[in-house]
Amino acid sequence: MGITVLKNEGLDFHARISTPLSEIDDDIQKELLDLTKKVKIAGFRAGKVPVSIVKKKYGTSVRNDIIERRINHSVNHVIKEHNLNIIGRPKIEELQNEPDKALEFTVKIELLPKITIPDLKKISLDRPKLEVNSKDVEEQLEKLAALTKSYTKESKAKIKDGVQVTIDAIGYIKDEAFEGGKLNDFKVVIGSNALIPGFEKQLIGSKTGSEVDVNVTFPENYHAKDLAGKDARFAVQIKSVHTAEPTVIDEEFAKKFQSNSLEELRTHFAKQIENESEEAINTIMKMNLFDKLEKLLDFDVPESLLEQEKNILKSETDKNDQDESLLKDKSPKEITEYYNKLALRRVRIGLLLAEYAKSKNLQLEPDDLRKVIMQQARNFPGQENMIFDFYKNNPRAIEGLKGPALEDKAVQYIFNNEIKLKEKKYTKEELEKYLEAEEQRITLI
């Protein structure tokens, strides 16, 4: 076997490999002789089939198998001999495979970069810490009390904020009833903003038995695209009005929600408020870490990984509403630059974290995968069980989660053992503003 290195620069390794015709013919002959002992052909005793007959029947397929084996063996030999850290499958080009000539081909191999892990202990980040106060907890208790009100007392008085109204309604656009615009025995609490903006307000002052024309404009971002931004009129009949007695937040109230005391329910809500912000904080902390890492990384990345990541980005953009896309007003050049920069960032950081996990011998545990599946499920409120069943019944889908799960584990290890974290305290209101601003920023990356 002859090997001529054509290129060994950066992340590209190209070589021309040749195998003498005599070696190919010897391999074929050995395979054919072996087959004479195994094949059964009518007219010949088992193990006594002439080589010429076997060659005539199986010669082409035997040769193809030998060529494939020789190519694989040669490529593996080159990889081992040159100690190549490859990514993806080697490409075979310029194949010379005539029966009367030596086997020759060019192999093109893409390499993983040599990654030097930066000194992560030099990185410092602020970590938001929510300080839950009594006002936050009382607001949650009041919301719970409002949600659990029982509207049992019928009222003949005029409709006002806080009452529950039962209505029938038919929606019209330009005097034509539209699909999905009919409501029957629909209950709504006035002031809850459960209906289109402006709808509930126009019912105030009416009474049971009244017929009211409600004029509204569907929001531009309304889920039904054929209605978004359009003016509509609803012919509404008020069927009944009910009020509720104020809910008293006391020990008995707490017991309705599996709490032994009101103080225990308050503690539960305080913890819940903290937990609700934790996932958003972790996501933003991860992006802030990546911002720091991006500035420290300058190694070349494999072109195939870069193209793969750009295709993923384009696919994500295509799935999103084009009217809301960050790229909707960008020129083709600007869009290309955006994809190139973001793909490079993602690939570099992904390779670094994989190398870091390897250096620390981080291994995935069942709990790590469960966490990632839970994160996936939270993206589909109301369909969590469907997501759990999907992963339970699709082992291949689980395989696709192992990369993100190991990345998350590496990030958490870095937070716990490497970088300096400085706790920064926020009230609930302050944290909400901070998270909103940060979420808008990270949509760009």
Curated annotation (Swiss-Prot):
State its Enzyme Commission number(s). Answer: 5.2.1.8
Question: What is a single molecular function from GO for this protein?
Answer: protein folding chaperone
The keyword Cell cycle belongs to this UniProt entry's keyword annotation: yes
Where does this protein reside within or beyond the cell? Cytoplasm
Q: Quickly give the catalysed reaction.
A: [protein]-peptidylproline (omega=180) = [protein]-peptidylproline (omega=0)
Q: Chief localization class? A: cytoplasm
Gene Ontology BP annotations: 'de novo' cotranslational protein folding; cell division; chaperone-mediated protein folding; protein transport; protein unfolding
PROSITE patterns, sorted: FKBP_PPIASE
Q: What class of enzyme is it?
A: isomerase
- Where would one find the signal peptide in this protein? none
Q: Which UniProt keywords apply?
A: Cell cycle, Cell division, Chaperone, Cytoplasm, Isomerase, Rotamase
Q: Does the keyword DNA repair apply?
A: no
A Pfam entry, by short name: FKBP_C
Which GO CC terms are listed, alphabetically?
cytoplasm
Query: Tell me, what does this protein do in biology?
Result: Involved in protein export. Acts as a chaperone by maintaining the newly synthesized protein in an open conformation. Functions as a peptidyl-prolyl cis-trans isomerase.
This protein's domain notes: Consists of 3 domains; the N-terminus binds the ribosome, the middle domain has PPIase activity, while the C-terminus has intrinsic chaperone activity on its own.
Report the PANTHER family cross-referenced here.
Answer: TRIGGER FACTOR CHAPERONE AND PEPTIDYL-PROLYL CIS/TRANS ISOMERASE, TRIGGER FACTOR-LIKE PROTEIN TIG, CHLOROPLASTIC
- Stated family: Belongs to the FKBP-type PPIase family. Tig subfamily.
Provide the protein name: Trigger factor
- Report the source organism: Rickettsia felis (strain ATCC VR-1525 / URRWXCal2) (Rickettsia azadi)
From the UniProt record, report the name of the gene that encodes this protein: tig
